[in-house]
């Protein structure tokens, strides 16, 4: 358990006995600490830090971040409503969506901020709300991510209005008398800090041509190391050159821009873990592999199968005792050959064993780095497995239930049979 900061072995056994597994576990102290780091991002003229709630939309997580002073970026109208139900004021929510919600008018009139992500969205907003304020998302022409599947900037990404279409943006603005008060970009998750800084400079160059812009969002994508030895972005180091660029912009253009950032992974990734139980241990002979099978898998954690993402893993013996170590592959519970939690780095097509404590049926197994894009992005209900329970470790280490395990009745609630099959 040395490679994982939480939960402790004792907490794992408590979770297994009291709540069952699989269980997502979020650590309140880590969430609050990461929020404080984001809010301290270097800025000369004011900062709004928005939590990209798609990373983990749990009401408990949203409530913690809101109380810490974070605002919200929602990727759909449904997320915006979900944030409000968790207690986030609508004026602290920005909607940045690929798909315009059917109730856009309702959301805007409630106070939700709108961020147009295409010329069509900008035109539609102008038709519905002439003369109103909004921001626009721009694709600056480059991107960066921990893999091509998380790169959301550059010519191969559909996110945002292409930076060369500024004249069309201005034409739509004039036609509907819109106030473009905000400019937004986001280039990927796990971004190279140098590319991120270069992108910020490009965005400021575009801002110079938009005299109404008062706030500039640089998005998120701050690299977070989940595995031991992996680097994480130091926000103070990455942010200081950006703050200096904002100061230079103010000197040259007479505008002191309010800065926004939009972290998701940075805030939540290492504040979450997945607790599972070992249900079998099998092997494929002397020339094969030793497998640990667990009662979780791609139905709870899709990132390894999707990206070849790496997560720290630890076996927790059912009783405290000394054991040796062995090389294992960890397999999920789905009837799917790709449901393996130990792929080669960035290559889900290959396998890579892990040196783990000798595992026995009934042991606990903890997967770290599961606070972001795990509960929010699983192969939900595959093989008809129910959604896992979610827990919050309070400041004193006590686990609290924040989402019940899905029941079979809930899983089937929306299914209907036509009369012909009755």
Question: Model-found features: residue ranges?
Answer:
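Active-site-proximal loop/turn and secondary-structure-junction residues that shape catalytic pockets
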Residues: 55-57, 78, 99-101, 118-120, ...
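Short acidic, glycine/serine/threonine-rich loops at helix termini
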Residues: 62, 85, 105-109, 126-128, ...
